Amino acid sequence: MVVRRKVHVLLIARSFHSYTPCFRVTTRGKRQRSKSKQQAKVELDHTRELDNDQATETVVDRSVGPEKDIESINKDFLQRTKGLEPDIELKQLPQIKQEFNQRYKDRYVKPSEDWYVNSWRSLTKPKIPLYKLINSDFQLITKLKAPNPMEFQPVQLMESPLNVGDFVLLKMRPNELAMCVSLPSSTMDPRYTFVTIDGTMCFATKNRVLLRIPHKLPAGIHSLIQPESHHKHLPIGTVKNFSNQTNILPIVARQLITSRYPAQISKLAWKDLPITTKKLQLLHRSLQNYMGPWQIPFFTLVGLVQKLDLNKALDDKNGINYLTSLVNNYHTVNDIPINSPTFVSTYWAIMQQQESNLWGEIHLNTALLSPISVTIIPLKSQHLYYAQVIEKLEANSYREVNKFVKLVNERKYRDISALYPSVIQLLKDFAAGNFHNNGIIVALISKIFRKIERYKDCDITRDICQDLINEITPNSIPNPLLLNMDLALPASSKLVKWQQKLYDLTNIEELQWKKSGTDDDRYDFGDLRVFCIDSETAHEIDDGVSVKNYGRDGLYTLYIHIADPTSMFPESTNVDIEGISTDILNVALKRSFTTYLPDTVVPMLPQSICHLSDLGKQGQRTKTISFSVDVKITSKCSGKSIEIMYDSFKIRKGIVSNFPKATYEDVDRILGTPNSEASPVKKDLESLSMISKLLREQRIKNSNAVIFGEGFNKGLVMLNADSEGELTEVTFSDQEETLSTILVSEMMILANTLTGRYFAENKIGGVFRCYKQLPLGEVAQQQYDSMITSTKKGIFPKLKDIVKLSSLLNSSFYTGRPFRHEMIGAKQYLTVTSPLRRFPDLINHLQIHRHLQKKPLCFNQTQIDSLIWPIQSRADILKRASRNSSTYWTLNYLKKLTKLEPERTFDVMVTSVPQNGFTGCVFPDLSFARGTLKLHPSSMHYPMIGDIVKNCKISKIDCLEGMLELEKL
C-alpha cells in the first residue's frame, strides 16, 4: 500500500500469477455520483487530489477491453505515477520476473555452477547437469565416495587435528552441528569458518569448539567458501574481514556437502535424546561412588549408552544384575566404534542432567577438541542432598531464606553457622565452581543476595559468595578453588581422604626391604658424577645427568639417570600380574600427576616412596633406570656440529651414588665463572652445556622444533605467608632461560626422544606424547613457516609474536600410538624422565623392567589405550586448575591494587580480533591477567592482535570466575 496525501493506490507487483490490474482511488464527499460518471472521469481523476467536500470512487473495469488496451493502461499509469514516490519504482510483471530470474541466476545459480566446475575436480563426483544443480535429485548423493561419518573411532581424533570437513558443536550454537569449511587465514585473524545446517556462516577460533566429529570431504574438493562475485545486485554473502568483500557458500555445496550429514546426525541425536537421558539415569546409579566424585572417560560412557539394552536394564528381576555386569566390564567397550548421533545426544543429555546435579563438568581436550571425560557426582551426598536443601529453602514462600537473610543483615554469624550449615555449604560449592548449568541453584542464590542489604545491588558472582562466606566463617580456606570437586584434594572428597590414608600408612620397612633386594642385574656406575640439577625447594628429585669425555675424536657418552620407584612394586617382575594390581599404583593412577598449585603441592606417590627413590643423596647407593648414548662433536669452519650415535643407545638398570651438589643457581654460577684451571665438576658441566646447546640447534635446524623467546611465562604466581602464616601474599616471577635450564631440558628431551624411538622399533606398547600442527590457510601457513625460519636463524618469537601465533598453535596430548611431536621435533616422544611425578612415565618404566628381563610386558596395547583417557583427563583437569588458581591470585592482586588506586590505568596487549567493540587482551607482564577490553566508541581504527593499547582502566573483576573487564579511556 503506497500512500500519497489523500490518494490510496493498491498495487500487486510481486506475485508470479497473472492478473488484470485494478486501480482504485477513494475520496470523501457528501454524495455519490453515478457509475457511468465515475467511469467517464477515471482518466481525469485517478491521480488528481480532490477536495474534502467531494466524494468520488473511481474504478477501472478489469473485465472489459482487449489485452492491448490493458497494456496501454498499464503503460500510461506507470508514466503518470513516475516520480510520485522516489523510493518506490513501479514495474510491470514481466519486468519483475525477468529481474528476479537474473538476480537468482547471479546470486545463486552462477556461484553454484562455478563451484561445481572449478572447485570440485574429481572423476568420482556425481554427474549432474548444470541446469539441475540446485535442488538436484537427492539419490545422486549416494554416488559420493566419502567416508561415512555416522560412526568413528576415537583414535581418529588423535590422528588429525581440526580440519575442513569436521563436524562440530560451537559454544555460540551448541544445539546443532556445523561443518568446518575454511581454515584460519592469517595471524591477524585466527578464526575458522563454520557453516550450520541452514547455511548460516559463522567465525570462531578453535577454543569455541565443544565437540568434534572427524570427517573427510569427498575427493577433489578444493574449497567450499568462495568470494562473492561482483554483480549489480545487493550482495547476499557474509562479511568476515573487509566490508567490501562478502563470502558465500554456494547452494549446491550446502545441499551436496555441508548439510547432509550434520542434518542427519542432529536429527537422530534429538530423536534419541529421551532414550539417552533415561540410559544415563540408570548408568549413573551404578557408576556413582558414594565416597566422592570421579571422572569416567567420555567415550567409555558413550560406549555404555550404545551397549545398554533398556528392556534388560528395566527388568524387575534381573535389571540390577544386568547393569552391574555391564558397568563392571565398562573398560571393554573402548574398541567399539562410536555412533555419532549417540555421541552428540550423550553430550546434550549430560548438559540437561547437570541441572539435577547428577553429572559434573564435561572435560574438553584442547588438542582433540572433544569431551574426554565427565565427572560423576555422588547420588546421596550431592544429588539427593541438594534436592532436599532446595525443597526446604523454597518451602512456605522461602521462609527459611528470609530467616537466613535476616540473620545476615543483623550480622549474627554464630547463629548462622549453627542453624544453616547447608546454606553455607551451598555457597561454598557455588564459589568453588561445583555447579554446572544449574539454573535452580543460581536462581536460589540470586534470591538470597537480592535480600541482603549490602549485596542487593551487586552482580551475583562467585566472588561475593566467597565474601559472604568469609564474613560468616572468617577462617575459611583462602582459595575456594581448592574445594573444587574435579581437583579432588582431600579437603573436598571422602574418597581422596581415604586414598591419602592409604598413602600415609604405606609400610616404609617393607619398602626398604624390597629396595635392598638383589642388585646383581644392575650396572654400578661407581664414582661417575651424577648432577641432579633442580631448585632448592624441589619436592621430588627424579633425574640426574652425567657425561664421559673420551678426549679424542670429539667422542662423549651422555647418561641420563632416572629414579626407579617401579622396582618396589611386584608389577615390575611378576609375570602373573597383567596391568595394575597394587593399591598404591591404583591410587597413583587416579592422581596421574603430582599436583602443583601456587597454594599447595600434592605428590602423585606416597612421600615414603618418593624419599626412598629420590636421587641426590651423596654416598647413598640409589637405584636408577639409566639411559646412555654416544655423541660425536665435529668442529667446522661454520662452528661445531653434533652427531648422535643411535646404535649406541642403551637402557640399563643402574646404581649411582656420587651426587655433587648442583642447583640451577649453582650450575649457572659455575658456568659463568672464568677459571683457567677448571675442576672436574666444571669440566663436566661445560661439556654438558656445550652438548645441550648443540642438541637444541640440531632440533631447530633439522626437525623444525619451536622455541619460545623473551616474554614467555612472565608473571608466574608465588605465594608468601602473611602475618598469620597463611599463603596469601602474592609476588610474581618470570621464567627465565639460562644455561642450566637449557642443559636439563635438552638432556631430558634427548632421553625421551631416544626411548620413544626404541619403543617404536621394538614394538613395545607405551604412553607417548604427541603434538600435531594445525592445518592452516595459505597466508597463515606462510607466517608460521616464517617463524620457523626465524627460529633457525636464532631469532626466537617474543611475546608479541607468541600472542599472534598462539591461536595457530595446537596442544600436545598423550596417546598409545608413536605419533610425531612436531613442536619438540621428535619422530616419537615417550616420557620416562619423571616417574615420581607422572604416571605415564611410571607405566613406561614398568614396560622397560619387563622388557629388560625378557618377560611378557606388563601392559598390552588395549590396556595402554584404555589408560590414555583417564591420564589425559587428569592432565587437563590439573592444567586448568593450575591456570585458574594462578588467575585467581593474579586478579586478587589487581583487585587490591585498584582499591588502593581507583584511577590506576594499565597497558594491555590485544589477543583477539575485535568484534562488536570488544577484544581479548592480556597484561604483558602478567601472563595470567587475561580479560576483555571495551574499545572506545569513537575509535576510527580498531587495534590488531599484538598491539599495545595504553590507558585502560579495570571496570570489573571476578577472581573466582577468572573474569577481567577493562575500558579504553
Swiss-Prot record:
GO cellular component terms given for this protein: mitochondrial degradosome; mitochondrial matrix; mitochondrion
The top EC class is: hydrolase
PROSITE patterns referenced in this protein's UniProt entry, alphabetically: RIBONUCLEASE_II
List the transmembrane segments: none
Question: In what ranges is there compositional bias, type Basic and acidic residues?
Answer: 40-51
Q: What is its EC number?
A: 3.1.13.1
Gene Ontology biological process terms, A to Z = mitochondrial RNA catabolic process; mRNA catabolic process
| Region described as Disordered | 28-54
Which InterPro entries would you find in this protein's record?
NA-bd_OB-fold, RNase_II/R, RNase_II/R_CS, RNR_Ribonuclease
Ranges for domain RNB come to 522-853
Query: Which controlled-vocabulary keywords does the entry list?
Result: Exonuclease, Hydrolase, Mitochondrion, Nuclease, RNA-binding, Transit peptide
Instruction: Give the protein's function.
Output: Essential for mitochondrial biogenesis. Required for intron-independent turnover and processing of mitochondrial RNA. Participates in 3' mtRNA processing where it hydrolyzes single-stranded RNA or partially double-stranded RNA with 3' single-stranded tails.
Which additional comment does the entry carry?
Present with 1070 molecules/cell in log phase SD medium.
Q: Which family does the similarity line name? A: Belongs to the RNR ribonuclease family.
Instruction: State whether it acts alone or in a complex, and with which partners, per the record.
Output: MSU1 and SUV3 are the two components of the mitochondrial degradosome (mtEXO).
In Swiss-Prot or TrEMBL terms, this protein is called: Exoribonuclease II, mitochondrial
Organism, scientific name: Saccharomyces cerevisiae (strain ATCC 204508 / S288c)
